Amino acid sequence: MDKERNAHQIVRKDGKGCFVESLNDSFSIGRCHLAFAAYDLNRPAGERQANLVQIYLDCGELLELCRKAESGELLLRLQDKKQKGDKTPLYQCMGGTSAEKLHRIGRPRPDGKSLSRIFQLLPGNKSDFLLVADSGPGETDEKGLIVPRFGKQPENHVVISLSMGHFCELLLLTRAHYLAWLTASYSRGEEKAFHTQEPEQIPTEPQEPEMAMF
């Protein structure tokens, strides 16, 4: 899996005992794949991964984040929140995989629940941003959205601190690869850039439609 992941890697940003990497393996389903991992170097080789959260951002939302970063809007919002001591997210994405889909692909949770995933972009203290990724049990509501049911105790939790520059590199390099993929798709004469039906196999873990908050 590590070799496959490195082959798909666009960019990786490291923090203390953790990293986030952007992967190009989900453009065909309209998603930008961010993998958050935490590790413990004191563990034996091959057992060092402590937490892993897979986040799939809608490609349109990634482009909107890029627009806000390039226009200076994101910086202004960050400065305003820091001046006011506002710790609420600058951006939040809630998604996951339903219990039914997990069962269908042979990855049911032991508790039979859905898998909830949350990504948040928060104002940092010592740096510009905190990127927070959590996953744990969830429930599917009547609208088909995955509602988290882990409170303040997620099963997997990864936090990475990034400067404005490093976060923009993550965004803009991912956008560059996505736009290159779109160009290649159209140049091959593909009728549509995205699959009209959900593929049988989705990289790593499939996602239900996600709800984002800017």
What are these regions (language model features)?
Residues 1-27, 203, 208-212:
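An N-terminus-focused feature that recognizes amino-terminal "leader" regions
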Residues 20-28, 55-59, 120-126, 159-166:
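Short, low-complexity cationic-aromatic patches
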Residues 52-72:
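Compact, glycine/acidic-enriched structural inserts
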Residues 59, 71, 76-100:
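Negatively charged, low-complexity tracts enriched in Asp/Glu with abundant Ser/Thr
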Residues 134-214:
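Mixed-charge, glycine-accented linear interaction segment located at domain edges/termini
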